[in-house]
Amino acid sequence: LAAMALAVTALAGCGSNDAATTGTDAATVAATTEAAGTTEAAGTTEAATDSEAVTGVKAGFIFLHDENSTYDLNFLNAAKAACEKLGIEYMTKTNIPEGQEAYEAACELADAGCNFIFADSFGHEDYIIEAAKEYPDVQFSHATGTKAHTEGLDNFHNAFASIYDGRYLAGIVAGMKLNEMIANGDITEDQAKMGYVGAYTYAEVMSGYTSFFLGARSVCPSVTMDVTFTGSWYDETAEKEAANKLIEGGCVLISQHADSMGAPTACETAGVPNVSYNGSTEAACPNTFLVSSRVNWEPYFEYAIKCVADGTPIDTDWCGTLETGSVELSDLGTAVAEGTAEAVEAAKADLIAGKTHVYDITTFTVDGKTLDSYEADIDTDPDYTPDHEVVSDGYFHESDVAFRSAPYFNVRIDG
């Protein structure tokens, strides 16, 4: 995979008005804007069924951006759905930077009575750990983080999902489209080049674009891919510029791991097929949208909230799967190739059954060689020292909770 840097920067991650419990009022009852971002305190709602209702939990959520970010909107929607399903009170804080503001937001939520607090961005982690140490009676969870298994705190947890499975399936959708373009004479086999707009050179991003590429190559053997990085999780101008440069460089299909509409809208303007992330972009890009993969966080939120209600421990590392409903594809767009739905369903069944492993070492090489062994940096020291063997049984074991839930695949494969 060819990687290009587009303004890559130094590595960095992906007010408390209390609300009265109202029982049936789903409306937001307070909203204030503070220096750290926006706080919304939402009232409790009736649980979907009596059997779903929990008591004794007030949840607080910290988001890097607001609903304008597809990444954060995905979390916002899941938090709302889970809390309303379980009938609990919850508060949200949006536009919280990856800095001391995250610690302050966590403390404000704890002081407002939240006993389950969740933060959604990689760079929030150190500040949430700091808050967890200060509030030992509050349970804190953090998405995409790497340190729960080494911190040794009973009240700090990491969570993620096997989104590489979703990316792989989305790659199959892309590969099927490339095959259609080849069959129609729009491109030759040698011109089946995809482009990928990534945010940072994190393992999470590398894991994602590699699984997407492997999915595409499983059905379109001649595919190649160029990858570029913007140095930001959310920069619509940079993402649009990156997509346009990839298109100008001969890429005939674009995907991304960045949070704005920059790449999808560039594709719609250029008439280039697009595979998006974190939610369907079909409404804005009806002519070029193919599919989107996402982590569905609702199952994790329900699990963690029920643990707090029951007084049972939350897993130190939790990784959702296709089976738990934590990894999802959107509905297919109208521009997909014929037979795509059937190909995706067959591949999904094989992934769930364990017949297919995304990082099967027989399906890729690194510098022309099979990856028979690889030590990953699981414990995350400042020097990123490799410390655990993660290749066994013929495949790279990504996001294995025996190690940690956050991705650690940081291998640049051939292609």
Feature-to-residue mapping (PLM):
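Sec-dependent N-terminal signal peptides
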Residues: L1-A5
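C-terminal motif of bacterial Sec signal peptides marking the signal peptidase cleavage site
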Residues: T9-G13
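A residue-level marker of the well-folded mature domains of exported/periplasmic proteins
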Residues: D18-G415
